[in-house]
Structures are given as C-alpha cells and as structure tokens.
A protein has these predicted regions:
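Histidine/acidic residue-rich metal-binding segments in metalloenzymes
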Residues: 149-325, 341
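Divalent metal-coordination and catalytic microenvironments
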Residues: 9, 22, 27, 50, ...
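Metal-associated gating/positioning segment near the N- to mid-region
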Residues: 48-128, 132
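C-terminal cap of metal-dependent C-N hydrolases
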Residues: 338-343, 398-464
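Active-site mouth loops of central-metabolism enzymes
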Residues: 60-81, 138-151, 170, 225-226
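Histidine-rich, glycine-flanked metal-binding segment
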Residues: 1-56, 70-74
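Alpha-helix-loop-beta-strand connector modules within alpha/beta enzyme cores
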Residues: 118-135, 185-197
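His/Asp/Glu-enriched, well-ordered alpha-helical/loop segment
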Residues: 217-249, 318-319, 323-324, 330-411
Length: 478
C-alpha cells in the first residue's frame, strides 16, 4: 500500500509537463504514471485537479538565527528569526529545503572560532537547527579573512562529509585576500566542491563610502552609489578569471547589476562552470524605491540598482544566464530593519522566503515570459543541481524525495502581513497582487501545509548531505 497518492494535477517532471499521478512510499516517489493508471491503494489520496504539481521549492540563500550587526540594529544582542519561524514561513511558501551558513560569516558564530576545525563548527551550527525546522536544511561553509592554512586543508574532509559549497566575500569585514582565495579555490576545486561568492570590489566600495560621507551624501537611498555597477563588473570578472585558472565552479550569490549578468554570460559562453543567482526583490524594485517612506526596507546588500539593471536581471533570468532565484533571507522586526539610515548602517535583508515562489510566478509565468518548466528550474531544480542535491531534491521522479508543492495558478491573492508566517511585523511585498499561489506543501511524503493550514512539526526537517555532480563543475549544466 502506498503512503500517499496525488492524482488529477498537471505535473512538472524532468522529462516535461503532463497529466500524471504520483505514488509515494517511505518518503520517496515510487511511481510517476499516466492519469488514473496507479491502481495501488493508498493511505492518503490528494486530488490536485486544477493545480500544478511541482518539486518543492529550494531556497539556496538564507541567514537564519544569525546575530545582527550592532551597527545595523542600533543595539547589541539582536538575532534574525529562528529556524522554526523561518522554516514555518518557508513551508507556507512552497519551500521544502533551504541552505543557510556555518562558519566565519559575522553573526553565525559567537566570537572568533577560527582555531576550531571546520567539522566542529559545522556540528555546532547544525545543533542550532536540528529538531527546530519544519523543512530540510543544509549549510554553505563561510571562509572569512586570512583563512589559516590548516582550515584550507580541512576543506576536502568537509566536502566528503556532505558540505559541498563554500562562501567567501570580496568586501566587508569578512573579505578574503586574493592570495588566500587562490588557495581556497584550488582546495575546493580539487575536492569537488563549488564556491559561493559575494563579489564586489572592496577598494571601490570603501572609496565611494568615504566620498559620499565627505560630500554629505551618505543617506541610505544612495546605497547604489557605494555598491555600484562597475564594482560588480570588475569583481565578477576577477573571480571568474581565478576560477578559470583553478578550474573551480562558481555560484555568484545575489547578482545585482546588468554588468554582473554580462560577466556571467561571457563566462558561460566560454563553457566555464559559472552560475548566477537573482533575488526576487532585485527583480522587482529599483533604487528609486529607496527614497520612498521607509524605502530602505527593500534593501538587501550589495544594493538595488537602476531600472536598467532590474530589466537586465529579468532578461538574464529569462534567457538562462541566471540559473536560480533566491531570497537572501534575513528576517528582523521593522524597528531593526529601519534603525540605520546611512550607507554604512542600513540593515540588509528581508523576510522573503515565503513570497519568492508566488512573486516569481506572477512576474514571469503568469505574464508568459517563462514556461512553468523554467519556473521549476529557477526555483528548485537548478539550485538542486548546482549545489549538490539533485536528483534527491528538485525533481518529481522515481527515487527522488517526495518533496512536492501543489500550486494553484488560478488563485488571485494579495500579499498581506496578516497572512504571512514569519516572525516579523512588516513585509516589503505588502499589497503585491499574486496570480498563482502555493497551497499545499509535502516534505518527504508528509503533508506539512494543507490548503494553507500548518500540519507539520519543527522536528520534521533533516540536515541534508550534498555532493556536486562532476558535470556541474565541468560546464554550465543549467
């Protein structure tokens, strides 16, 4: 007997879209068959008529249970929302797996932990999430500053343990010098991992910050002048050149400028394994919105830029230059988010893990800009492939985890704070009119959200070991 059968829906599979029924047993998809052809009995049967049946969303970029910089928060001791709250919001938004951070990024650890091994630090971070997540989760490991040689030598062990991606910054206090980057890239590339890179030119950012302060133009609405287009252009291309030299795959987090997208396109045209991520607020807002009342609530670092950049990012998502959509989830309350009002003190991030799927669907699928298959690629499958979860995650296929979202393309819904599920008191998407919305979320065969009602438990989520396929690291596979 099957544990669960889903019938009547329009299913997006790796081989295309069709009218299929799905059989689930022991947390796995065991049958994907033509409509009405599954004759096995099931404990639970779900009628998905009129719905898309999609792989569960994968959020590749979150900052959960992270200490907020005192410069941003205006006071010490502030944390972003807990794993329980963030994963609850994720589940309601059709997301079944998210990737957070362990290691040297500011706020993910208490004090300097660089004398401890990568595995010890991973275990400590995992203990914060285990038993407290409605959905599955994994970690990128952040390498910050002048990374000790002994830490670089531990990268191979971390990859073997299931941590396949390593985050670095080229600016801010976590900046890694390029000599150390060279060694890190070689170690990650030789171990079969992939780099996740926040790329800006640190000299340019610092120069522009000082210039804007000197000229009295350091208001938060000028963030795009400090974290600017040419900085992204130069930094992306330097990282790509280093990755080419070391034969290392690159995943650029939060591409913000058209120049960043052009750099990624140039690399991919050379068949380099370079991938880019788009945040859904970057696909919608421009820096002009910073000037509105409470306008910096939309901000995520580096900076939201010009209308031409927003349009360029949209086109890059449509044409496949950018492979994934993400949130850079960083949920606080409104007083924290708006505490700082200068280019150095505006708080980054927002509570977007629940809104990503319906916003992206509304902007791109309901308008005919991309197909439903492309939507699945950018919200689930590509992240699974690039970051080492495919085909366990990101696919409705025999043998895959039964992570599934039922998405109603005919549901017209206005996003309101009252109907969101994060621990926060604001949403930058308040009033956004959605054409299509996730209604039911299934994690490894268990219904955790049923027609908008939470059914799961914060003990449902598991840590996920990952391994990037060699094909992803050889050429741009997706």
């Amino acid at each position: 007997m099957l544990d669960l059968k889903i019938h009547g829906g329009t299913v997006v599979t790796p081989s295309g879209v069709g009218q299929f029924d799905i059989g689930i047993q022991d947390e796995k998809i065991v049958l994907v068959a033509a409509r009405n052809s599954i004759i096995d009995e099931s404990q639970i049967s779900i009628d998905a008529s009129g719905k898309y049946v999609l792989p569960g969303g994968i959020e590749p970029h979150t900052h959960i249970a992270t200490r907020v910089s005192e410069d941003w928060a205006g006071r010490p001791g502030v944390m972003t929302q807990s794993p329980e709250a963030a994963s609850r919001a994720a589940a309601h938004g059709g997301v079944t797996t998210y990737i957070d951070f362990a290691g040297g990024m500011e706020g993910t650890e208490e004090g300097d932990q660089s004398d401890k091994s990568i595995m010890t630090r991973l275990d400590a971070r995992r203990s914060v999430f285990s038993g407290h997540s409605y959905t599955d989760f994994a970690f990128h490991f952040t390498l910050a500053g002048e990374v000790p040689t002994r830490t670089i030598e531990e990268i191979g062990e971390a990859v073997q343990s299931g941590v396949s991606s390593f985050k670095i910054f080229t600016t801010f206090g976590s900046k890694v010098p390029y000599g150390h980057l060279w060694a890190i890239f070689e170690a990650v590339g030789n171990s079969g991992g992939i780099m996740a890179v926040h790329a800006e030119d640190d000299d340019m950012v610092k120069y522009m910050e000082a210039k804007l302060i000197r000229e009295g133009r350091d208001q938060g609405y000028n963030l795009h002048l400090a974290h600017n287009n040419i900085s992204e252009d130069i930094s992306f291309r330097k990282i790509i050149r280093l990755s080419e030299h070391t034969e290392t795959g690159i995943y650029f987090v939060h591409t913000t400028a058209k120049e960043g997208a052009y750099a990624i396109a140039d690399a991919r045209n050379k068949q380099l394994p370079v991938y880019g991520e788009a945040l859904h607020n970057y696909l919608h807002f421009t820096h002009d919105h910073y000037r509105e009342p409470e306008g910096t609530a939309i901000h995520t670092y580096p900076a939201i830029k010009h209308a031409s950049d927003r349009d360029g990012l949209q086109e890059a998502l449509i044409n496949g230059t950018l492979s994934t959509t993400a949130t850079d989830e960083y949920t606080t309350y409104k007083d924290i988010k708006l505490s700082g009002n200068t280019i150095e003190t505006v708080c980054g991030g927002h509570n977007g893990i629940e809104t990503r799927l319906p916003v992206v669907y509304t902007k791109f699928v309901s308008t005919g800009l991309i197909s439903i298959e492309h939507f699945v690629d950018t919200t689930s499958t590509n992240a699974a492939k690039i970051l080492g979860m495919y085909p366990q995650k990101g696919a409705i296929a025999t043998g895959s985890d039964a992570d599934i979202v039922l998405f109603d393309p005919d549901m017209n819904k206005t996003i309101t704070l009252d109907e969101l599920h994060a621990d926060s008191d604001y949403s930058i998407w308040e009033g956004f009119e959605c054409q299509g919305y996730p209604v039911t979320t299934i994690l490894r065969g268990k219904v955790i959200v049923d027609n908008g009602e939470l059914k799961g438990s914060p003990t449902d989520g598991n840590w996920l070991a990952r391994k990037v396929a060699p094909s992803v690291l050889a050429n741009p596979e997706c």
